[in-house]
From Swiss-Prot:
GO biological-process terms attached to the record: photosynthesis, light reaction
Organism: Cicer arietinum (Chickpea)
Keyword terms of this UniProt record: Chloroplast, Membrane, NAD, NADP, Plastid, Plastoquinone, Quinone, Thylakoid, Translocase, Transport
InterPro entries listed in its UniProt record: NADH_Q_OxRdtase_suD, NADH_UbQ_OxRdtase_49kDa_CS, NDH1_su_D/H, NiFe-Hase_large
Catalysed reactions listed for this entry: a plastoquinone + NADH + (n+1) H(+)(in) = a plastoquinol + NAD(+) + n H(+)(out); a plastoquinone + NADPH + (n+1) H(+)(in) = a plastoquinol + NADP(+) + n H(+)(out)
Name assigned to this protein: NAD(P)H-quinone oxidoreductase subunit H, chloroplastic
Length: 393
């Protein structure tokens, strides 16, 4: 009697670049043995727009609207890094009020980014209800952004030496109201999700990254802090005025998808604490360093004072980058967002190298999904939190 032999043919499956769970135009070539993942190869570049080369052909002022298209869900951070580099190169002082406004906007943007991570992440693993809840709170944040900047997304709010406009009348009270309301909503999320047995079954022990591994791969943000390393650039670098606020770095030691979820939930609570302290202590004074608004008079015809007072539109300020090089970074919602900037005494940067956190965090995905089930790919990919705009640039 012949014993039937089982077939061991491997199946190759393309996930994306249009798959609804791909969080953008990411393509995964997955090799499967039944339900088990044998190999996974990410294919990037579908959203490449040449952002670094564009930067080298624009002044900083002209380039600011472009940077909001990197991570289009946390645009305040891309704006912050774009102005922080020239400010440090040119030794430009930012007024205290402008720094407080920046911190408030950055932390609101962090909450909005984490909310739009939480909803699709829960939808990926089968829970649809939180997906609708998070939009309720996110719209309130966008209402605040719209009142302060004029735009719900792509704000174009940061400027070299400050911000583009002061906070409007009544905005601080509205922001206080949102903070008090949002704390109750986060508690609701925790009741709904954190102890849910089906949720725990899907995320606990899935996609574990060890402490040594996370350092060797160069991961950052919640990916790093979920593996037991208390590293947050807001504490380490003390940029803007974060050292003036009382808050704690959120971290876990398990290193799995559940730990990454808990870190982000904790970060939203800490962001509210920072915002409340900034709103209470925001000083008076100017919202931008007016000395930076310099014009290259030699290239323009002579203007008299009368015309300057009544002219509708002035020419763009020309800021020459000193002949130096600098690496500057901020703690974005997804990790360490940095730029390596080289100036050569010109209005255009000589080199503008972007360090996107999502691109580096994504590199560990093939290792995490090997020997896991096909359904776990969505859980692990969702817990990494990627945006293809900043990965492909």
């Amino acid at each position: 009697m012949n014993v039937p032999t089982t077939r061991k043919d491997l199946m190759i499956v393309n996930m994306g670049p249009q798959h609804p769970s791909m969080h953008g135009v990411l393509r995964l070539i997955v090799t499967l043995d039944g339900e088990d993942v044998i190999d996974c190869e990410p294919i990037l570049g579908y959203l490449h727009r040449g952002m670094e080369k564009i930067a080298e052909n624009r002044t900083i002022i002209q380039y600011l609207p472009y940077v909001t298209r990197w991570d289009y869900l946390a645009t305040m951070f891309t704006e912050a890094i774009t102005v922080n580099g020239p400010e440090q190169l040119g030794n430009i002082q930012v007024p205290k009020r402008a720094s407080y406004i920046r911190v408030i906007m950055l932390e609101l943007s962090r909450i909005a980014s984490h909310l739009l991570w939480l909803g699709p992440f829960m939808a990926d693993i089968g829970a649809q209800t939180p997906f609708f809840y998070i939009f309720r709170e996110r719209e309130l944040i966008y209402d605040l952004f719209e009142a302060a900047t004029g735009m719900r997304m792509m704000h174009n709010f940061f400027r070299i030496g400050g911000v583009s406009a002061d906070l409007p009348y009544g905005w601080i009270d509205k922001c206080f109201d949102f903070c008090n309301y949002f704390l109750t909503r986060v508690i609701e999320y925790q009741k709904l999700i954190t102890r849910n047995p089906i949720f725990l079954e899907r995320v606990e022990g899935v996609g574990i990254i060890g402490r040594e591994e996370v350092i060797n791969w160069g991961l950052s943000g919640p990916m790093l802090r979920a593996s037991g390393i208390q590293w947050d650039l807001r504490k380490v670098d003390n940029y803007e005025c974060y050292e003036e606020f009382d808050w704690e770095v959120q971290w876990q030691k398990e290193g799995d998808s559940l730990a990454r979820y808990l870190v982000r939930i904790g970060e939203m609570m800490e962001s509210i604490k920072i915002i409340q302290q900034a709103l209470e202590g925001i000083p008076g004074g100017p919202y931008e360093n007016l000395e930076i608004r310099s014009f290259d008079r030699e290239k323009e015809p002579e203007w008299n004072d009368f015309e300057y007072r009544f002219i509708g539109k002035k020419s763009s300020p020309t800021f020459e980058l000193p002949k130096q090089e600098l690496y500057v970074r901020v703690e974005a919602p997804k990790g360490e967002l940095g730029i390596f900037l080289i100036g050569d005494q010109n209005g255009f940067p000589w080199r503008w190298k972007i360090r996107p956190p999502g691109f580096i965090n994504l590199q560990i995905l093939p290792q995490l999904v090997k020997r896991m089930k096909l359904a776990d790919i969505m859980t692990i990919l969702g817990s990494i939190d990627i945006i293809m705009g900043e990965i492909d640039r």
